[in-house]
Amino acid sequence: MDTPPLSESDSESDACLASDQELQDAFSRGLLKPGLNVVLEKPKKAVNDVSGLKQCLAEFRRDLEWVERLDVTLGPVPEVSETQPTPQNQDQKKGVNPEDDFQREMSFYRQAQAAVLAVLPRLHQLQVPTKRPTDYFAEMAKSDQQMQKIRQKLQTKQAAMEKSEKAKQLRALRKYGKKVQTEVLQKRQREKAHMMNAIKKYQKGFSDKLDFLEGDQKPVERSAKAGGKGQQMSKGPNAKRRYKNQKFGFGGKKKGSKWNTKESYDDVSSFRAKVAHGKGSRRPGKKGANKRPGKRARQKLKSKAR
């Protein structure tokens, strides 16, 4: 059975469906750019310019006199004044720190100086003048005086950095010292509080030994009799309280303090018969003289004083 040929409308719809599917696939892969355009990647071409490479090689191989080139190659140059190796010199041999301005500038200076010293004999052999004529007044980019100023400035900067580092270390040490001192003081306070609590317990009879004693001394143990006395004393007031009661009087509970007891009832040592029956040496009918003046006398004295 032969299939009927597709019409133009059917072919256009199939093309649209295919293009829509391609756009969806490109969008899912992230290849769509603004404007719904798909950027097609072009294949990279390997450039092999043989003639250009040969021309560069010919320029490298050009044999010129050294006077025309005046090139010299030197490695890292150590300081001349260094006789013994130091950790700083060993670090310089390993490599110059690009962040250190002083070290970097000094390496440039030493390398340039060594290159000049290596080239001068060869220039003298070739009879090339190396000194500036007297009528040549053009100065170089940086004179020796300017270089000396730069050197002094770099030295000052390095000294300031070292001073700042030392100050930081001192501050850190002081902070650590204060922290240690605070810990020591807190430890002493805790030990003192523990010792005072142990002494109070020992005095009140709650403990029979003192654990804070150190050294060769054995811990003091309370005997049975001492412990018994301590327990008995703990029931009543201590010596300080008894002394204050004796001096200022008992300031505690007053209710029932004047009640009679069996011991006070049987105690007749303070009984005086003459005083009880009024047979003392006092004269009857005479009372002690009243030293305070009367009301009228006080008013008269007050008016006279005005």
Curated annotation (Swiss-Prot):
There is a cross-link at residues 93, 179, 218 (Glycyl lysine isopeptide (Lys-Gly) (interchain with G-Cter in SUMO2)). The keyword Acetylation applies. The modification Phosphothreonine is found at residue 3. It is found in: Nucleus, Nucleolus. Its main location: nucleus. Residues 274-306 have a biased composition (Basic residues). Residues 1-20, 75-103, 150-169, 213-306 are annotated as: Disordered. GO terms for cellular component: chromosome; nucleolus. It comes from the Eukaryota. Keywords: Acetylation, Coiled coil, Isopeptide bond, Nucleus, Phosphoprotein, Ribosome biogenesis, Ubl conjugation. Residues 91-103, 213-224 have a biased composition (Basic and acidic residues). PANTHER family: RRNA PROCESSING PROTEIN EBNA1-BINDING PROTEIN-RELATED (PTHR13028), RRNA-PROCESSING PROTEIN EBP2-RELATED (PTHR13028:SF0). Interacts with WDR46. Required for the processing of the 27S pre-rRNA. This is Probable rRNA-processing protein EBP2.
